[in-house]
């Protein structure tokens, strides 16, 4: 997404915040918690909440290094004292959830509506605590058409409401 902004393929992108991007304006617009998902018959499936350290013995399905959320999840695991064994790495949230549903491992993912329709158990992460912020991203210091600026203003207004809850 960020690369698409830089090449002017996109006027606006919605994604996680990336470090070391001085030419990009990141405006927070929504938040989302991270959860652990496990297959329905997994030994952890009866848990309501979990310390991420308790997940380290199990194979994980993770996000690839190209994913914006990967550094955040890695940081959470380092806070817990270790990194999980990655059975598979993919880029998209839904692909991670699909591999977990098929029994290929467990995963830390954003809490998203599709999880309710998949054969996985959703477990709240008690430690470490964290929430994901989504950003509206645009290039700084470039001309933007009036319609783009109007859309940015609309999103900012809606974001104020979303971020209060």
Task: Give residue spans per PLM region.
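Short beta-strand-to-loop elements that line the ligand-binding cleft
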Residues: 16-17, 83-92
């Amino acid at each position: 997404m960020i690369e698409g902004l830089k090449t002017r393929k996109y006027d606006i992108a919605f994604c996680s915040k990336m470090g070391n991007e001085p030419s990009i304006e990141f405006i927070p617009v929504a938040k989302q918690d991270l959860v652990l998902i496990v297959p329905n018959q997994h030994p952890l499936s009866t848990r309501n909440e979990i310390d991420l350290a308790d997940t380290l013995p199990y194979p994980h399905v993770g996000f690839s290094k190209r994913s914006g959320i990967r550094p955040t999840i890695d940081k959470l695991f380092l806070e817990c004292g270790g990194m999980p064994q990655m059975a598979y790495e993919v880029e998209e949230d839904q692909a991670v959830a699909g591999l977990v549903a098929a029994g290929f491992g467990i995963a830390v993912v954003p809490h998203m509506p599709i999880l309710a329709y998949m054969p996985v158990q959703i477990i709240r992460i008690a430690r470490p605590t964290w929430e994901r912020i989504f950003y509206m991203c645009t290039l700084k210091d470039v001309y933007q058409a009036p319609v783009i600026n109007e859309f940015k203003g609309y999103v900012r207004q809606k974001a104020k409401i979303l971020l209060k809850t």
